[in-house]
Amino acid sequence: MASTFSDTFSASKGELMRRAEDGLAANVGDSGLTTGEKVALTCRVLFDAGHDSGLAGQITARAEQPGTYYTQRLGLGFDEITAGNLLVVDEDLNVLAGDGMANPANRFHSWVYRGRPDVQCIVHTHAFHVAALSMLEVPLVVSQMDTTPLYDDCAFLADWPGVPVGNEEGEIISAALGDKKAVLLAHHGQLVAGASVEEACSLAVLIERAAALQLAAMAAGPIKELPERLAREAHDWTLRPQRSQANFAYYARRALTRHPDVLTG
C-alpha cells in the first residue's frame, strides 16, 4: 500500500483528478430515495440552511409523467413538508395528486421546465443573505473556492418584474436564466435549476453561502477575482454528479436527524 501511495507523487494533477473521478464513480451512487422523498428532504435541508421566508419560495422537481412536477402545498412552510403531503401538478398548476393548491408563483417554474429539458429540479427561495444582496442590484460574485460550482453559472436579473404569478414574469425569469444553473433576482431572491434534485439542493446551499461571503467581503474592501482558468477547472470538478450526490447524502442525514418525520407518507 505504501508503495502504491508513493507512486502517485509523480503523477500529474490531471491524472490524480481522473483517479479521483474513478473513485467517486465506484463509491458514490444514487441514494435510492424517490423523487418526492428527495424534494421533501431538500425542503428541510434548506429550511435549516436559512432559506425560510414564511411561505415564500418553491422547490419543485419533474414527476414521472411528462409536463408534471412535484411541489409544496400552499400554506405549508419548508419545515412542514413531508414526502406524503407534496402535490403533483401539471404546467397549468392543476393538481393531479395530493390535497390543496400549489403556490401560484409556481407558474415561472413551468416556464423554466418548458424551456430547459435538462432541468430536473428548481429551487426558488428568498434566503436571507441572497435577499439582502439582491437589494443592492449587483450580480453574485464567485471568488472563493467552495462556491466555484456557481462560477460563471449564475445569471443576474437586474429589473424586478413584480410578483411572479403571470406569464410575463415566467418569460422574463426564464430568459434571464438562459443556460445557467442559477439566477440572482434583484429585489427578490434566487433560482437554481439543477440537473438533479441533489445538484439543485447543493447549489441552493452554496448560493446563500456565496451571498453571505460577498456581503462580508464587500464590507471589508474590493473583492478580488479568481483566475479564470483555475476557477473553471474548479467549477467543472466540483459540479460532477457524484459530488452532488455525496453532498446531498450528507445534508439528508442531517435533515433526517433533525426532522425524522420528513419521509412519512
Show which residues each predicted segment covers:
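Glycine-rich flexible loops
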Residues: 2-265
